[in-house]
Structure formats: structure tokens, C-alpha cells
Amino acid sequence: MNDFIKLAPIKKIQGTIHLPGSKSISNRALLLAAQATGTTQLTNLLDSDDVRCMLDALRNLGVSYCLSNNRKTCEINGIGGPIQSKNNNQLILSLGNAGTVMRPLIAALSVQTQNIVLTGHPRMKDRPIAHLVDALRQGGARIEYMERNGYPPIRLYGGYYGGEIFIKGSISSQFLSSVLMMTPLAYRDTLIKVDGALVSRPYIDITLSLMKIFGINIQHDNYRVFYCKGNMAYQSPGDYLVEGDASSASYFLAASAIRGGTVRVIGVGRNSKQGDIYFANILESMGAKIAWGDNYIECTRGADLNAVDLDVNNIPDAAMTLAITALFSINGPTILRNIYNWRVKESDRLAAMATELRKIGAEIVEGYDYLQITPPFKIESAYINTYDDHRIAMCFSLVALSDVSIIINNPKCTDKTFPDFFTQLSSISVLQ
């Protein structure tokens, strides 16, 4: 198999995309269902590397489930409480580069007494977890760094009981989400106080919404203080439909705004809890035409696209798609602000995007927490490194909407969240 894909110039985009399930929702729902009382059937589950990591980890921890042949429906038999390893000896779980598995499991496995090592891909060992570990230790958790302080791999001994804890919100919302999902299963109540700015707040809304579906309602004071009752139990909702991935929708909506035609993405709509649906509003402000339904978003190319200057902290994944969309704007630089957390994702996305955008001719200013993109007079064909990062691969595929081809290395990295991305893109593309 080739370790690259060459995308020919695309003349027009037109069609309908059925979105894969949301990665963030899939892995949260799996973890909550595993700890709930009763059996839960999840449908439209994402079939991807990250979700397989969560499923493998849960099986190794003694959770039983039945997965359909297409891996999109999963029936989970909840254990009715916090997860505890059935292995009396040390258990080692390797979690790839899946932050939506590593961070929540650190918290979930900090309640019961056990001896579990969590490790993963080399890049995972560069992704910080100190803010999460510090918060859990305040509540009694015994956690040991095995190599570098502040980073995986780690050893978990359990011991979290509750109390008042402080957690920093400036690096990743996954830290707060992970603690929130664990606290109902602790022995005592937990009062969580957020220290500093809270990034990617819509992901907290996803977490709180899912917890409510599983029977736990968390009160908070403007996202600064969270009041979490302990000694509670999650209750299975029975059936739960995982909505489509709004981050994945961004590529197809942007493609339509650039080279439409009309594209309809099915699986998310006006009532979605995912912050990345706001990307459609940004496209509209840039000149695209947007229509909303309960279960779809539709984009039609309108006027030439305008540049934007935005704080995109609440949509960190879809904001990457904006960086590529900016190449096709007509009136000056686009500036994406408050994106430091790009640096601690699957790659240092800020540095990676700057490097690869320069290859195709864009004038780039890379700041500590911002990116300024001035479109080139003519986009140049290039060989794009993806840094084993699915979102970089999918973003740069949109360069083919110009009049040049683009070569994407390691296209299989999209297996992390969207295994058939290139097939789906091809299905709505008319080549030049």
C-alpha cells in the first residue's frame, strides 16, 4: 500500500455526506455505559483507532460488550460502579495516542484500589497530564509518574475519595471532563474549582449533557465551580444514538464554501451540543450560504470568501479547517487567535500547520497562541507531511480545491477518527 495519496485538482463539490459518529461522544458514552447500572445500546458509534483503544481497554478491565459486525452498534453490560481491574497483579494498558481515552481513564481508575499502568504511543508521552494528576491527588488519588513528571506513562493505585479540588483549565478541557465523569462514583462529594481560563468550553457541555442522559445532573456556577455529589450511580438510558462528528463536518462544509455546489452533512444539526457546529456560522460570515435542519447542516458557495480575525478557542479542531479555508479568501490575512492548545494535541499543530502552509505558498506568522495566514497569489503543489495527525491530513486535502494537485503522506492516519475520509471526499468531488 502507498504511504501517500495524490489528490487531483477538484473542479466542483456537490453531494451529501453521512457523518461518522463523534469521537468525543463515542468514547465518553462508552465509559459512562461501562460504569452504569443496566445494559446500554450505543448506535452510530465511531469505528476508528481511538474508539478501538477505548473498547480494548474496557475489555481488559473486565467490562463485557457485544459489538456489531460493522462496529457501529455496541451493547455494553454496565458494572454499576467504578471500574476496578480484575487482575490482582499489575495491569498495563497501552492507549495509542488517544487523549479521549488516556485522560478519562486516568480519572476513572483513580477511585478503586488497584495497580494499573497507562502508557501509549511515543507522542502520547509528550502530551501533558499534570493538571489532571494534580487535581486527582488533591482528592486522595495515588498516582506515580514512571518516566517524566507531568507526562505518561503513569501508575495508578486508586484512592480518590472527593473533597475540594482545584483544576487548571488553560491546557485542555479533557482534564475537567475526566474529573467530572468520575466524581459521582467517589465516596464523598467533590467541589471542583476551575483555576484560570477554561479552554474549549463546548466540550464540557458535551460531558455534562451525557452525564445527565446517564442520570447524573451536575450543578455549576458559570463553569467556575462545579458541585458534584458522590456515592451516586449512573443509570443506563437503554438506547443512545451517537450524533455525527461536527469536526469532521467542517471539511465538507468548507469544501462547499470554496468550490460549491451544495453539500449537506447529515448527523448534526441546529440542536447539537458540539461546539464545532459554530464553524458553519463562521463560513456564513465569510460569504457562504448556510441552512440548518434538526439533523443536517447544508452549505452552498455564495460570494467570494472574506478573511476573518477570530478567537477560535472554543472550536480548536474546526479552527484548523479555517486555516485552509483562509487560503481561498480575497481580502487580506486571516488571524486565528487563542489556539495555544493546538500545541498539545496529536502533534504540535500550530508549528505543523505553519510549516505545511508555507510549503504551498502562504505567508505565515506563527505566534505563541495565534496563526496569521495571508493567501498566496497562486497556491503551489506540495508534498504534505501529516505528523501522524489525522486532522492535518484531512485539512490539507482541501488544497486540491485549487488548480493544483496535493500529495498527502501517511493518509492512513485518518483512521484515528475518519477511516473512509478520502473515499467520502471523492464521492462529492468533480475533478478538473
UniProtKB/Swiss-Prot annotation:
HAMAP family in the record: EPSP_synth
Subunit details: Monomer.
Amino acids binding phosphoenolpyruvate: 23, 99, 127, 174, 349, 391, 416
A Pfam family the protein falls into: EPSP_synthase
Annotated transmembrane regions: none
Reactions listed under catalytic activity: 3-phosphoshikimate + phosphoenolpyruvate = 5-O-(1-carboxyvinyl)-3-phosphoshikimate + phosphate
The name this protein goes by in its record: 3-phosphoshikimate 1-carboxyvinyltransferase
Compartments reported by the entry: Cytoplasm
PROSITE patterns named among the record's database cross-references: EPSP_SYNTHASE_1, EPSP_SYNTHASE_2
Pathway linked to the protein: Metabolic intermediate biosynthesis; chorismate biosynthesis; chorismate from D-erythrose 4-phosphate and phosphoenolpyruvate: step 6/7
Family statement: Belongs to the EPSP synthase family.
Keywords: Amino-acid biosynthesis, Aromatic amino acid biosynthesis, Cytoplasm, Transferase
